Amino acid sequence: LAPLRDGRPVPPPSLEFDQPFTIAPSFGVGWFGQTALLAHRAGSQFAQRFSASAVEWVRPGNALVLHLDDPVAQIRLSMHLELDEDDVLLLRSRLVNTGADALEVQWLAAGTVPLPGEAAEVRSYVGQWANEFQLQVDRLSRSLWQRENRRGRTSHDTFPGAVVALPGATEHTGVVFGAHLGWSGNHRQTIEWLHDGQFQWQMGEW
């Protein structure tokens, strides 16, 4: 009974192993959703395969740095996770090129977090000059939800954050998840439906 209790069924047609959700998903391990990193060296080494090399406790019980290495692609990805006194999770990522050749980075997520499959809608904020923070509500489905800023700075039309709500959530009650990217440049956030029925949420810069 252990496989039924501890594992998840493999949906057809898919790889014959269960690729678990991670904080830094990548193509090299068989993850076919949005990845945490898009980078290459002259068109090669684009499918990174990270493995944990060290865990550094910054504050035991509250903050740590997870160091992930790919010796073939010659890169190190360090993920900083911190839970503050209000139970807000802070995520930061740092990418280091450990090779001799130039590495072209097209996208790096500050973090990847799971969302429950019953998540119903995403509430984001749009606008224009003197009319910022206008509420935009979109239903979540099996389509990819994406919001992107290409202006190279903070914009009036694309706030780097959103709120994901479960059914029945209002401004005063219910279950919601909020996230904000602390970056005043080009940025992107995506919410993607996964094959197991859950969602993943990414925010980062490009």
What are the functions of these language-model segments?
Residues L1-W206:
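Polysaccharide-binding surfaces and accessory modules of carbohydrate-active proteins
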